[in-house]
Amino acid sequence: DGSLIVAIMNRLLDTKIRLITGYKGTSDQLLALERGEIDGSAMAYSTVLTLRPNLHQAKEISVLLQIGRAKHSDLPNVPLLSELVKSEEDRAAVAVIFDKYEMGRPFFAPTGVPAERVALLRAAFDASMKDPELIAEAKKQKLEMNPLGGAHVQALIDRLYSSPEKTVQRARQLLGTEK
């Protein structure tokens, strides 16, 4: 996803970021950043907080841009990509591409599950996200928890699937996957 973010920034913001690939994961990228092998990286802020919280706390890194519809509470002064994009058409295409970040890693059930069972599963999930033991374990592991309810995730999916064809085509152009 980092290379995708960089490619879209280069296309929409006229940045000239040179992408360096070959790092096996975010830990290797962060190590390369600390060693001065690379000048930056595009990765989840929560990953930095989990793997190298000292980098942000010691102000050894600066977060330049956020992806998504809402700013992280730790980063109120860091702009969203959508705030920097000039046209409404491109903002809509960026939303189609990056709304998945708001969902995180959703849980799904197969098509055809009765509505009352879906409601039960959603209620159980919501309750589990409030479990003090789970929250304590997440904090212990320095994991950020920002659960979204099933209705919210469903609304995001519905919005994506109702995107106008023109917006989807522009998103494909930005991704380099035009038909």
Question: Where does each model-flagged region fall?
Answer:
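Generic anion/oxyanion-binding catalytic loop in active/binding sites
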Residues: 18, 70, 110, 142-145
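Short, surface-exposed, polar/charged, turn-prone segments marking secondary-structure boundaries
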Residues: 20-24, 45-49, 68-71, 90-94, ...
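C-terminal lobe and pocket-closing loops
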Residues: 51-129, 178-179
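Charged, low-complexity, helix-prone segments enriched in Lys/Glu/Asp/Gln
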Residues: 41, 98-103, 159-167
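A generic alpha-helix surface/boundary motif
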Residues: 3-4, 102, 132
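An extracytoplasmic/periplasmic, membrane-proximal ligand-sensing/linker region
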Residues: 60, 84-86, 113-179
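A broad detector of the eukaryotic-type serine/threonine protein kinase catalytic domain
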Residues: 14-15, 38, 106-108, 143
